[in-house]
Regions:
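Glycine-rich flexible loops
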Residues: 1-320
């Protein structure tokens, strides 16, 4: 329990003292919020997701006040990101790119045009997700790939579940390749559903927001917590997971002994072109999947969120 917020499936890490020390520094609070979100891998995988804030700043050429968006730049990790990991861009210039946008076939050229919108010349390179934040009017925005949300977003009835679970307070945008047009689709969803607290992207992830860094942080946690509660309830109601158990797991000591024997062989094979580090996991949830009836059917289907491809590649090797 912290400041009236209690969560079961996510970690509430906000420290009032640390946040107070950053009072008035919206970009500093953005970095702080990003680090907290990235510290919980249930919210987004390493290197995944992006966050932003919009602030007023003085234009160095005209001396006029302008709106600037600070957003996680290309690459990097939310959990360890510093200020130099952000890109700062003129909001009005980003939004005016709609006047030269030629359609989905020309998404790549739009990424190059982001460079003409840069406010801080020391910025990190803008990512392809930049327009997704630019076309939403909110001061603080989080875009994450939480496992619990993706379980809904990637399901056959994802849109209907989202609508029912959140009583219409979370919008829905079907899957499409990230880019400029997806930013326009987010804006359209918001225009058609004023007052929503977030948007679920089919087979992709989640957008949430707030007027302050703290409001955005708590909103994000609350939405993900609701998704996780739903997944847990459905799992318990359905009884069998992944078709039920096919194999019984070995005792822990025996599992570790076999892993110790097998690891050098697998690591050697995986390191044939470059050195690799191996990791062994016998988490109960992992065992539930690898020992299941549906392993052979589900494993080749790959991950449910394209963002995870960066770390796991498309599908795993299954050894009997």
């Amino acid at each position: 329990m912290a400041n009236g917020h209690s969560f079961k499936h996510v970690s509430y890490l906000w420290d009032e003292a640390k946040a107070a020390a950053l009072h008035g520094d919206e970009v500093g609070l953005l970095v702080y919020r990003s680090n907290l979100l990235g510290a919980d891998l249930r919210l987004t995988n390493y290197g995944g997701g992006n966050t932003s804030c919009k602030v007023k700043a003085m234009d160095p050429i005209s001396a006029n006040e302008v709106e600037v968006m600070w957003v996680k730049g290309s690459g990097g990790d939310l959990g360890t990101m510093k200020r130099n990991g952000l890109a700062a861009l003129y909001v009005d210039r980003l939004r005016s790119l709609v006047n030269v946008y030629r359609g989905k076939a020309f998404e790549d050229e739009m990424v190059q045009l982001f460079n003409h919108c840069i406010y801080d010349l020391d910025s990190k390179a803008p990512s392809i997700d930049t327009p997704l934040h630019a076309f939403l009017p909110f001061k603080h925005i989080d875009h994450l790939h939480p496992d619990a949300a993706i379980a809904i977003a990637a399901s056959k009835d994802g849109e209907a579940i989202t609508k029912e679970l959140f009583k219409g307070t979370i919008g829905w945008v079907p899957w499409q390749r990230p880019g400029f047009d997806l930013g326009l689709q987010l804006k359209k969803c918001l225009d058609e559903n004023p007052g929503i607290r977030g948007i679920m992207l089919g087979s992709h992830g989640l957008f949430t927001w707030g007027n302050t860094a703290y409001e955005s942080y708590v909103n994000t946690l609350e939405v993900i917590e609701t998704c996780a509660d739903f997944v847990e309830q459905m799992t318990q109601a359905n009884g069998l997971v992944f078709g039920g158990e096919k194999l019984t797991a070995l005792p822990e000591s025996e599992r570790r002994k076999q892993a110790l024997t097998l690891a050098p062989v697998l690591r050697g094979l995986c390191s044939s072109q470059q050195s690799m580090i191996g990791h062994f996991s016998d988490d109960p949830r992992v065992l539930q999947f690898v020992n299941s009836q549906d392993l052979q059917r589900l494993a080749p289907m790959g991950t449910s969120c394209p963002d995870h491809f960066l770390r796991t590649k498309i599908s795993p090797l299954v050894l009997d």
